[in-house]
Swiss-Prot record:
Protein task: Synthesizes alpha-1,4-glucan chains using ADP-glucose.
Root EC class: transferase
Catalyzed chemical reaction(s): [(1->4)-alpha-D-glucosyl](n) + ADP-alpha-D-glucose = [(1->4)-alpha-D-glucosyl](n+1) + ADP + H(+)
GO molecular function: alpha-1,4-glucan glucosyltransferase (ADP-glucose donor) activity; alpha-1,4-glucan glucosyltransferase (UDP-glucose donor) activity
Pathway where it operates: Glycan biosynthesis; glycogen biosynthesis
Coiled coil: none
Family, as annotated: Belongs to the glycosyltransferase 1 family. Bacterial/plant glycogen synthase subfamily.
InterPro entries assigned to the protein according to its UniProt record, in alphabetical order: Glyco_trans_1, GS/SS, Starch_synth_cat_dom
Name this protein carries in UniProt: Glycogen synthase 2
Classification via HAMAP family: Glycogen_synth (MF_00484)
The protein's Enzyme Commission number: 2.4.1.21
Length: 484
């Protein structure tokens, strides 16, 4: 079976990245094309991409003129054709002045912008005759209206991937003011619309797929998700193992492999020196690369870190940005621990790689985690994850039991400062035993987190959709759940 699959998303690595969704959209189509599928990506042409894509020398090539132009929500949408840099994946860029600001998310017009984008994608799929998809693979609330609009298209199926259920997009009353809604539309917001009307729904890890069926993690949509039944499943994300390879990564001070970890000591010293920490190969160096938001467990970190630094000969490095309150608290903590703690605001890809390749442990005390990619990258680089058992962290990190020689990291269950502190202390104590610690590192490095395994599961999902009967019959009221 060869399917024509259109990935619709707000971001795609390497050209536009805020969260893990960009890594999925930028990596999975590459692997699917290697498996013989005709996969293409469509996303907004943001203002910061205008200088990168164009017909001029030195720019990523794109069509000089739009390949498609049409009225959408009373405005003209233009679509240009290009290729995702570094790949052979065709890329469609939706152009409109609303995408001109140099940002991806936020702003007063965020809901309008992505409703406009979703509408343009649906119109494009209906009317662009040179290439017509069999399946539109939608990602998060930004594209949630596409399955609703395509629900009566007999020849186009939809997959809706939930990357983070907490963000649900505009409500129905807001949608009614912006665009037209199908007569059968009965969802309260765009996240619910994507779940309700997609032929298949998946989350980015099996555990998260189970968690969101409960009131604790369902964000008010647990009944709808439970109604979805077998059409909701979890497919674990992967990572680009060619990009994230400690043997060849140019961002590292020294490359290394599972057979020779000596380069990690060089990277550790370089990381300490670069960030003004005391250079000491024997100190327990903790690293973290994350958005500073409640989801990532930053409040737990703030409650725990001062006491743990006082208890142990350890250091801590954090790279990230987010809520102003958390940024301020982290900055204050770094000032209290000169030479032992460093905070770098923003996102610096090369520094992130050096943290993976030089830190001894990687902290992920998440309140919830749909999948998480950082722990996979950390393990590939021999950086041992310390994670709370939630969502995709359950599926990727197993607790280290030294006496049995099993496990790839350290885990704790309750979202409590005491549990996090205890987990840190156990990892610190294990770090003192170099032989068992190195064996722990190597088990993590040997774990297969490539996209190949995940891509095969997505292929099976696409096959299910290709074999479905025509969809218009499913719009009758007896096949709809209660309004969601």
């Amino acid at each position: 079976m060869q399917a024509r699959i259109l990935f619709a998303a707000a971001e795609a690595a390497p050209i536009a990245k805020v969260g893990g969704m960009a890594d999925v959209v930028g990596s999975l189509p590459v692997v699917l094309r290697k498996l013989g599928q005709d996969v293409r990506i469509i996303m907004p042409l943001y203002g910061f991409l205008w200088d990168k894509f164009g017909p001029e020398p030195g720019q990523y090539p794109r069509s000089k003129d739009p390949i498609w132009s049409k009225q959408v929500m009373g405005q003209v949408a233009d679509i240009y054709e290009s290729v995702l840099p570094g790949t052979d994946v065709p890329l469609y860029l939706v152009s409109h002045y609303c995408f001109a600001p140099h940002r991806i998310y936020y702003g007063e017009d965020e809901f309008w912008r992505f409703t406009f984008f979703a509408n343009a994608v649906a119109e494009f799929a209906w009317t662009y005759y040179p290439w017509k998809p069999n399946i539109i693979h939608c990602h998060d609330w930004h594209t949630g209206m596409i399955p609703a609009w395509m629900h009566q298209a007999p020849d186009i199926g939809t997959v809706f991937t939930i990357h983070n259920l907490a963000y649900q997009g505009p409500w129905r009353w807001q949608l009614e003011r912006m665009t037209w809604l199908p007569w059968y539309f009965s969802a309260h917001n765009t996240m619910a619309a994507g779940i309700l009307y997609a032929d298949q729904v998946n989350t980015v890890s099996p555990t998260y797929a189970m968690e969101i069926r409960t009131s604790l993690h369902g964000e008010g949509l647990q009944d709808l998700l439970a109604w979805k039944g077998e059409r909701l499943r979890g497919i674990l994300n992967g990572i680009d193992t060619e990009k994230f390879d400690p043997r060849t990564d140019p961002a590292l001070e020294a490359n290394f492999s599972i057979d020779d970890l000596s380069g990690r000591a060089v990277n550790k010293a370089a990381l300490q020196s670069r960030l003004g920490l005391t250079v000491n190969p024997d100190v327990f160096l903790m690293g973290m690369v994350a958005r500073l938001v409640e989801q990532k467990g930053i409040d737990l970190l703030i409650q725990t870190l001062d006491r743990f630094l006082a208890y142990s000969d350890s250091q801590f490095v954090l790279l990230g940005s987010g809520e102003a309150y958390y940024e301020g608290r982290i900055r204050e903590m770094a000032e209290r621990h000169p030479g032992r703690m460093a905070y770098q605001q923003g996102y610096q890809p090369q520094l992130a790689q050096l943290i993976y390749g030089g830190a001894d442990v990687f902290l992920m005390p998440s309140r919830f985690e749909p999948c998480g990619i950082s722990q996979m990258i950390a393990m590939r680089y021999g950086c041992v994850p310390i994670a709370r058992r939630t969502g995709g962290l359950v599926d990727t990190v197993s607790h280290h039991i030294p006496s049995k020689g099993i496990g790839t990291g350290y885990c704790f269950d309750r979202y409590e400062a005491l549990d996090f502190y205890t987990c840190l202390a156990r990892a610190w104590e294990a770090f003192q035993h170099k032989d068992t610690w190195q064996a722990l590192q190597k088990r993590g490095m040997a774990t297969d987190f490539s996209w190949q395994r995940s891509a095969l599961e997505y292929l099976r999902l696409y096959e299910l959709i290709m074999n479905l009967p025509l969809r218009p019959e499913k719009t009758s009221s007896e096949n709809q759940p209660a309004p969601t």
